Swiss-Prot record:
Keywords for this protein: Amino-acid biosynthesis, Cytoplasm, Histidine biosynthesis, Hydrolase, Lyase, Magnesium, Metal-binding, Multifunctional enzyme, Zinc
Pfam families according to UniProt: Hydrolase_like, IGPD
Protein's UniProt name: Histidine biosynthesis bifunctional protein HisB
Needed cofactors: Mg(2+); Zn(2+)
PROSITE patterns named among the record's database cross-references: IGP_DEHYDRATASE_1 (PS00954), IGP_DEHYDRATASE_2 (PS00955)
Main location per the UniProt record: cytoplasm
Source species of the chain: Legionella pneumophila (strain Lens)
Length: 352
């Protein structure tokens, strides 16, 4: 579904003039940073809808032609930079008219909202007034202000980072896993499991994946470590899949080939289809309190929850290094596959 930014005009896209009316070309000045911010957001797959109150268009105080000349000039400015608005909604009334279309009311968008499916959790209103915040509440979407202390650069960063995070709580009779990921954050991850070696491996995934991972996991180790490792992999896959959202603009594919005395290769396709092929032989039963048979099972569980095809092969002598190489290459491949470098969905089907 669409991710929509409902954007105010005066005071948000262009500076608000002293008399609060853009009726001549010499009053038009773009707000600082608006062009690069909108280009970033457009690349991230957002649809732009302009929604603006314009007091008294068509009156003596605000002739229709004065509005039209300025409005078309503003649209041409943005269009010249590759920024397009899918729809534009203008309320021409004054507050005294008590119309149903003036923000914060939503009447202006009634038909559009009925005909358009969009993801409310990933959609925002951006504006400079309290009425824009009320408008966002009435639409059931998020809100971010534009002001001298809250710039377009900050708005773009907040939206892009927020759009790529997710939390999963997985509680069963055997385990309790509380996990969150933020794909575009390089904060130091905080990971706590009762198996130090497993914790260390997950730290490698987050570090080399370039994302923030917060994890608190516990389980029935008195039975064995199977349930804990499996459920953690499932939660991690679910969180990354959710954080990717509609996968607009991602690379989709990831592959890497790092070496020490061990060699691990991996290829990932975040296609929505689960398949895992793990090739590697471990002659030791346990490494750091973790059964080596759980290594391929971790990748299989991750593949299933993430909806990804994973091919991985590892060879070497030192089993610690072999396993660590597997988790490091997983992180590097996820970093590559989840990176947003395109302005399209990488699938001829139109969905991933």
């Amino acid at each position: 579904m669409k991710k929509i930014l409902f954007i105010d005009r005066d005071g948000t896209l262009v500076e608000e003039p002293f008399d609060f009316q853009v009726d001549s070309l010499d009053k038009i000045k773009l707000t600082s940073g608006v062009i690069p911010a909108l280009l970033q957001l457009q690349k991230a797959g957002f649809t732009f809808i302009m929604v603006s109150n314009q007091n008294g268009i068509g009156t003596v105080a605000f002739p229709e032609e004065d509005f039209a000349v300025c409005h078309e000039f503003i649209l041409d400015l943005f269009s010249s930079q590759g920024i397009l608005f899918d729809e534009i909604f203008i309320c021409p009334h004054t507050p005294e008219d008590n119309c149903i279309c003036r923000k914060p009311k939503t009447g202006l968008l009634e038909s559009y909202l009925k005909e358009t499916a969009f993801a409310k959790q990933y959609s925002w209103v951006i504006g400079d007034r309290d009425t824009d915040k009320e408008f966002a509440d009435n639409l059931g979407v998020n809100f971010l202000p534009i002001s001298k202390t809250h710039t377009w650069e900050m708005v773009a960063s907040a939206i892009i980072n927020d759009a790529r995070k997710a939390s999963v709580q997985r509680k069963t009779k055997e385990t309790a896993v509380d996990l969150s990921v933020q794909l575009d954050s390089d904060q130091t991850s905080v990971i706590d499991t009762p198996i130090p070696f497993f914790t260390h491996m997950l730290e490698q995934v987050a570090k080399h994946g370039g994302f923030d991972l917060r994890l608190q996991a516990s389980g029935d180790l008195e039975v064995d470590e199977h349930h804990l490792i499996e459920d953690t992999a499932i939660a991690l896959g679910e969180a990354i899949r959710t954080a990717l959202g509609d996968k607009w603009g991602i690379n989709r594919y990831g592959y890497t080939l790092p070496m020490d005395e061990s060699l691990a290769t991996i290829a990932i396709d975040i296609s929505g289809r689960s398949f895992c092929d793990f090739k590697g032989q471990f002659t030791r039963e346990f490494i750091g309190g973790m059964a080596t048979e759980m290594i391929p099972h971790f990748f299989q569980s991750l593949s299933s929850a993430l909806g990804a095809t994973i091919h991985i092969e590892v060879t070497g002598i030192n089993h610690h290094h072999m396993i660590e190489a597997c988790f490091k290459v997983l992180g590097r491949a996820l970093r590559q596959a989840c990176s947003r470098t395109n302005n399209y969905l990488p699938s001829t089907k139109g969905v991933l």
